[in-house]
Each structure stands twice: as structure tokens, then as C-alpha cells.
A protein has these predicted regions:
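Bacterial N-terminal signal peptides
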Residues: 1-8
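Initiator methionine at the very start of the polypeptide chain
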Residues: 1, 15-16
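Surface-exposed, polar/charged interaction patches used for macromolecular assembly or partner binding
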Residues: 16-449
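Sec/Tat signal peptide C-region and signal peptidase I cleavage site
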Residues: 9-15
Length: 449
């Protein structure tokens, strides 16, 4: 990732640097759910996955987000509270598709997790809210760097964290004037609401699965989808089932599966007003009375190959690579599935082509469309983003920037689904459109709907 960052800096124009520097990023707190392995065969793999997760520098790996960690990144499953059926329904009601999928998996010989995805999400959410995670996130935004968000003794009157991450359009002089004239709350208001309302927590649950479990799941999903398709679409649906069955014959080994659950801070103007009316001058009251909440956004599930066997010579390296690839894929799926979570990234021009430093790691595919934006400064000095066009990823233009791209490791699992069309000669992703007066350096892009 460091080499990519350096390359970006070396090829970025002054105009582009200015655009990127004005972009207010979403904030993410990445966490891991610690659970016991399904069987003893996976015990060592779980240790490798845990070590791999702890070694991730999320500020670099997901550089288009603010790394907004509260410190501890682990949740012990044995400390997670139980939930009622009503609490699960509040997250997501069980559908006929869910029931059919469970039935199809059992028919195919797959051991179904007795804990449903909606139960995982509901229990994690209850854990967060019972342990005041939202309070800690709110506090972290308003405290000096390094202060304890669990025990607030006083707020940072300069609102340094919000100023640094949310007011990128202000000059140093304008920042100084805001502090000197005690006009900080007025200056920071809009930025504060945007930053806090786009503060997310992502919890990753890692499991191991065999090729048979992986392919059976794909077949079952295709079969369930087929049952809900209208007449004209059933031909395509049956083709999807057949494709999954064919892929099953070519998929071998063991895989890392990552289920990612996304939550966000529940924040709006009324929460902003309540914070300053009730707690700004009474930090002790915040410790005893504040009851901010996280809310559930959604989930994703992705897998990546590990070893052909669990005793391969390089099984640790293969498992670590699989964990990183699955983490990236699940994170990218959350972006694709939930528009509010999608980041912007810089658009560049190289050899007369529009390019961006995103690729397979971000699950970019040929034909993907991106909206193009330019920054505009409002009267209040806040930055607004104006859409000026749409561009499309070229047919042979996807860069393979996945973990360990181009590196062959002996003993790797075989994954028939890992057939994304990438151009191994590229060092960036190329768009089919050409630069124009409106679209080029100085623009930002975001995945379109």
C-alpha cells in the first residue's frame, strides 16, 4: 500500500492535490468478532487470521476513510448479549428466501450455522449500545487527541479533531480567526454534523470453509434466487445455477470467509443541539446521562482462497493472504451495496487517459460507472461537490491491486469464481472516456448507482 501511496503522490498534479485535500472522508472503526473455530482442524488458521487482522494498518489500507479507532479492535463473542425475536426483527425480518436457503444448504449437506446473520447483527448492535460505544465515538470527536472517551473531564474548546478532518477548505488564517473570535461552533457546525453522521463501525467475523461448503452455498443461493424470478427471467436464473454447478467442479481446497456487519452513529441536528445544550458545559453529565446509539446499516459476505489443504507447506502465508483478500472484498461489497458508505477517490490523467488508483481490491469491474465531481466553495467556506459527468471503466482496464497480486504461492486453493477480468500490465484502472475541459485532473469520482 505504501508504494501505491507514493506513486499517487508522485503523479498527482497540484489541482488534484487541492481537490483531494478538500474531500471530507467518512470515518471507520474496524473491529473483529472473536469466536472459537468450528473444529480443531481450523484452530491454527484462526490464530493466523487473528494475527493478520491485528497487523493491518487500516489508515493505509482504506486510505479513503478516516481511521477512527477507539483502541481495542476485538469483541469477545462470549460477552455478547442474547436478543429477543423482536430485537432481531428490528434489524431484519426473516424472509422466505432465508428459510429456503437454509433448507437448500441442508439438502446439499452443508452444516448451517444455528445463529442467523440477523441474529449476529442484532446481538452485536445490542453489545455496542449496552457498552456505550456511541458515547465514546461522540466524545472522541470533541476531545483532544489521546484523551479518554470513557471518562470525559473536559472538552477540546478548539474542536481540533473536527477542524482537522472536517474543515479542509479553511486556510490556517481562517482557522486561527475562528478560534480567536470564539466562533468555532458556528464555523464547525455543518462539518461536525457531516463527520458524526458518517461515522461507521465495521465488525468482521472470520470463518474457514471447504470448497464443498463454498460451492454448495453458491448453488443454493442461485437455486433460491431462481424460485423468486418471474417467468422471462428464469432462463437466466437457470443459467446461473448451471454456472455455479460447473464452478463447483473446478473449486478445490479451503477458503477464508468474512462476514462484515456495518453500523453507523445515529446523529442529526437534534443530537447536535442536545449535545451542546446538555453536555458542552457539563462534561460530567455526559459521563452519567448521555445515551447515544449506533444503528445497523447492513452486511456483506465474501470469501477468498487459502490452501489446498490445511497442512500445506505455506499454509500460514496462504491463510493470511486469504484473510486480507476476503476482508477487502467484504469491505468493497459494503460500499457497492450501501451508497451512503461509498467513498470518493481522485481522478488522474496519464498518457491521455483517465485513470484512478483503484482496482480489483475495491472489487472494480469492467463497465462500472463512476460519477465525476468538482469542488465548489460555499459562502460559509464549506465545500460542496458538483457532479459534472459520468465515466465508465474500460473493457480491459481493471488494475489487479489485490493482496499479493501476481505472486504465485505453492499449495494455493483453486477458485473457479476468481476469474475477474484484470489487466496484469496495468498500474492503475483505466476508463473508456477521454479527458475533457470538465473531466480530468482536479476531479473526484464515486461509484454510481
Amino acid at each position: 500500500m505504501l508504494s501505491i501511496a507514493v506513486m499517487c503522490l508522485n503523479t498527482t498534479s497540484k489541482a488534484q492535490e487541492n481537490a483531494d485535500s478538500k474531500y471530507t472522508r467518512n470515518s471507520i472503526y474496524m473491529m473483529k468478532l472473536d469466536m472459537a473455530p468450528e473444529n480443531e482442524e481450523y484452530k491454527h488458521a484462526f490464530e493466523v487470521m487473528n494475527k493478520t487482522f491485528d497487523g493491518i494498518d487500516f489508515a493505509k489500507r482504506y486510505e479513503r476513510y478516516n481511521d477512527f479507532s477507539l483502541g481495542n479492535r476485538h469483541i469477545d463473542w462470549t460477552t455478547i448479549p442474547e436478543v429477543t425475536a423482536a430485537e432481531m426483527d428490528a434489524i431484519e425480518k426473516e424472509s422466505k428466501k432465508d428459510q429456503l436457503l437454509k433448507s437448500e444448504l441442508e439438502k446439499l449437506g452443508v452444516k448451517v450455522d444455528p445463529i442467523s446473520e440477523r441474529e449476529y447483527a442484532a446481538r452485536i448492535l445490542k453489545y455496542f449500545n449496552e457498552n456505550k460505544y456511541a458515547n465514546q465515538l461522540v466524545a472522541k470527536w470533541h476531545l483532544s487527541e489521546g484523551a479518554d472517551p470513557k471518562n470525559v473531564t473536559g472538552w477540546d474548546e478548539k474542536l481540533s479533531v473536527i477542524m482537522n478532518l472536517g474543515l479542509k477548505g479553511l486556510s490556517e488564517e481562517e482557522r486561527a480567526n475562528a478560534i480567536a473570535t470564539e466562533n468555532i461552533l458556528q464555523v464547525c457546525g455543518d462539518a461536525e454534523n457531516k463527520l458524526l453522521s458518517t461515522t461507521y463501525v465495521c465488525v468482521n467475523n472470520y470463518r474457514m470453509m471447504t470448497a464443498q461448503e463454498k460451492t454448495a452455498t453458491a448453488i443454493a443461493l442461485a437455486q433460491v434466487a431462481l424460485q423468486f424470478m418471474p417467468g422471462p427471467a428464469k432462463i437466466a436464473g437457470q443459467a446461473a445455477v448451471t454456472a455455479a454447478q460447473v464452478a463447483a467442479e473446478k473449486t478445490k481446497g479451503y477458503f477464508v470467509k468474512t462476514n462484515a456487519y456495518l453500523f453507523k452513529l445515529d446523529w442529526d441536528q437534534s443530537k447536535f443541539d442536545g449535545f451542546y445544550n446538555n453536555y458542552w458545559n457539563k462534561p460530567d453529565a455526559f459521563n452519567t446521562s448521555a445515551n447515544y446509539q449506533l444503528k445497523y446499516v447492513g452486511k456483506s459476505s465474501k470469501s477468498a482462497g487459502a490452501g489446498m489443504t490445511m497442512k500445506a507447506a505455506k499454509v500460514d502465508e496462504l491463510t493470511a493472504r486469504g484473510a486480507l483478500r476476503a476482508t477487502d472484498a467484504a469491505f468493497a461489497a459494503l460500499q457497492r451495496n450501501y451508497e451512503e458508505f461509498r467513498p470518493m477517490c481522485s481522478l488522474h490523467v496519464e498518457d491521455g487517459k483517465l485513470i484512478a488508483y483503484i482496482g480489483k481490491k475495491e472489487s472494480i469491474k469492467a463497465g462500472d460507472k463512476f460519477n465525476v465531481f468538482i469542488p465548489e466553495e460555499g459562502k460559509d467556506k464549506t465545500i460542496k461537490w458538483k457532479q459534472v459527468g459520468t465515466i465508465k471503466v474500460d473493457k480491459n482496464g481493471v488494475w489487479d491491486n489485490s493482496e499479493g497480486a501476481g505472486q504465485t504461492i505453492d499449495g494455493a486453493a483453486e477458485d473457479a469464481d476468481d476469474k475477474d477480468e484484470v489487466n496484469t500490465a496495468l498500474k492503475y484502472t483505466v476508463f473508456a472516456d477521454k479527458p475533457s475541459k470538465k473531466i480530468g485532473e482536479g476531479c473526484m469520482i464515486r461509484l454510481a448507482k
